[in-house]
Amino acid sequence: MDDLKYIKKILRNRIKYKIIINKKNIGVGRSRNIGIQKSNSKYIAFCDADDLWHKKKTQLQLEIMKKNKLSFTHSSYNLINSKNKIIGKMRVKKFLEYKDLIKSCDIALSSVIIKRSLLKKSLNFGHTKTKEDYLLWLKLSKITKIYGINKTLLSWRKTDNSLSSDVSQKFYDAYKVYKNIENKNVLTTIFLVLRLSIFYLIKKITQKLSNVFY
């Protein structure tokens, strides 16, 4: 059974849904923007094809958002491999600001739920190959609180052949984000990319060390 048929099967009689098929490959950023534009829901949630939501993720997350009048939340998550084995854990801070995100970003896209009213034409996913979500989080951090829920509500799959695993592409896109979109000068951009690289290496080392305990 192909993925589309499987999705239709599990969603049948459960929720209202609409499947949008692009006529050509336009990239993940543009595809998400189209989905947001066609949505009429109050909230938008994301789930990449290889990630796993925990059973009560949306229920728990929306309860917290409504109770605390929040517009943007994300959660802690497990990192898993292609065999669903836990290879790391990521715990999130309660609040993130722009000054935090410009240094490093551990927000898992598939853990995010956001109010659709925040996502306007000027505030949508970028068109880079890997940092399209990071770019949007930077923009949104200037106008709303980013609230981290310290509960593991997602299993984020780490695969060697995914775009997010392409380190050189990551740093190239980070350079474009800082230089061309965040309008940083060349020296500041180089400094920010170097700092991002250091945080990335520290995180990778920490994850490798933590694997001993799983």
Regions found by a protein language model. Give the residues of each.
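Conserved nucleotide-sugar donor-binding catalytic segment
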Residues: 37, 89-169, 173, 177
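Non-catalytic, C-terminal membrane-associated alpha-helical segments of glycosyltransferases
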Residues: 161-214
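Acidic donor-binding segment of Leloir-type glycosyltransferases
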Residues: 1-21
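Conserved donor NDP-sugar-binding/catalytic core segment of glycosyltransferases
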Residues: 56-87
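The conserved acidic donor/metal-binding loop of glycosyltransferases
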Residues: 48-52, 76
